[in-house]
């Protein structure tokens, strides 16, 4: 009976800690939402700037439902507040999982935890400053003397958020692949061998994550393939370092046990 109580106690403690971490995270999102709602109009104008630069200063967006402008500002505030709360969310996640990790596991994961939001920000920045102007020029090129573009707030925000998230996720590809390489789940040789299949998968992923037009699909597929190659490049460094570490450990074992090089190469001699 006492054993059951002792086993349940750590579980209850973990659940209480998880609840506290979640409450802090939700609180951070709410605070971020409230702060961003005060500037929701300015944030939306910032997001709409690439479109206005192409349409001209006199161009305006429309909303076709009475509540559309209000709920658009709510969505803008939520996504901006979520982005603002990211440091708190990552900190709470790390504080929850870190005590259950060994020192070498913490050392391996911590750099990836720091670089993850940075890479996502880089992907979103690429979308905003490079992809948006090119994509909007392409879309607006279908205007004519009888056809005029009248973008609505809701549809524009949906497109912008979708592209920012898509490019942000794309830039996270090295994090996932390098963690898999570090864990020994995949190898750079395997990634190179399957490169042609992954190129096809890149275009499939781009088709899923972007609007159904070939222009934005290609614009997203190119960074996916670039991130793939970057993962292979840095993955080789991880494998090289691991091989050197294993060789050093093997040499140290041989030195401690007075084993010559032939014995190191033939493990059956170690017995």
UniProtKB/Swiss-Prot annotation:
InterPro entries: Sec-indep_translocase_CS (IPR019820), TatC (IPR002033). It comes from the Bacteria. GO terms for molecular function: proton motive force dependent protein transmembrane transporter activity. Its main location: membrane. It is a multi-pass membrane protein. The chain crosses the membrane at residues 24-44, 78-98, 112-132, 159-179, 215-235. Pfam families: TatC. Keywords: Cell inner membrane, Cell membrane, Membrane, Protein transport, Translocation, Transmembrane, Transmembrane helix, Transport. GO terms for cellular component: TAT protein transport complex. Residues 247-271 are annotated as: Disordered. It is found in: Cell inner membrane. Part of the twin-arginine translocation (Tat) system that transports large folded proteins containing a characteristic twin-arginine motif in their signal peptide across membranes. Together with TatB, TatC is part of a receptor directly interacting with Tat signal peptides. The Tat system comprises two distinct complexes: a TatABC complex, containing multiple copies of TatA, TatB and TatC subunits, and a separate TatA complex, containing only TatA subunits. Substrates initially bind to the TatABC complex, which probably triggers association of the separate TatA complex to form the active translocon. Belongs to the TatC family. This is Sec-independent protein translocase protein TatC. The lineage of its organism: Bacteria, Pseudomonadati, Pseudomonadota, Alphaproteobacteria, Magnetococcales. The gene is tatC.
């Amino acid at each position: 009976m006492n054993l059951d109580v002792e086993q349940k106690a750590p579980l209850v403690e973990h659940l209480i800690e998880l609840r506290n971490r979640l409450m802090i995270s939700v609180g951070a999102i709410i605070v971020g939402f409230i702060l961003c709602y005060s500037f929701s109009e300015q944030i939306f104008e910032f997001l709409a700037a690439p479109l206005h630069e192409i349409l001209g200063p006199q161009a305006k967006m429309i909303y076709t439902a009475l509540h559309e402008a209000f709920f658009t500002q709510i969505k803008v505030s939520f996504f901006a507040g979520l982005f603002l709360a990211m440091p708190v969310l990552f900190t709470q996640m790390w504080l929850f999982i870190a005590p259950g990790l060994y020192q070498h596991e913490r050392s391996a994961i911590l750099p990836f935890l720091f670089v993850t939001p940075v890479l996502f920000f880089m992907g979103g920045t690429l979308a905003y400053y490079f992809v948006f102007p090119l994509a909007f020029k392409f879309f607006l090129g279908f205007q004519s003397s009888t056809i005029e573009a009248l973008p609505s707030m809701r549809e524009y925000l949906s497109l912008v958020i979708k592209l920012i998230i898509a490019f942000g996720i794309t830039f996270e590809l090295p994090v996932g692949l390098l963690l898999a390489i570090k864990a020994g789940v995949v190898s750079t040789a395997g990634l190179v061998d399957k490169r042609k299949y992954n190129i096809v998968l890149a275009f499939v992923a781009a088709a899923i994550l972007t609007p159904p037009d070939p222009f934005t699909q290609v614009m997203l597929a190119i960074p996916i393939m670039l991130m793939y190659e970057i993962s292979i490049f840095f993955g080789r460094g991880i494998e090289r370092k691991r091989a050197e570490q294993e060789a050093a450990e093997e040499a140290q074992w041989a030195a401690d046990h007075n084993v010559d090089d032939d014995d190191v190469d033939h493990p059956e001699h170690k017995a």
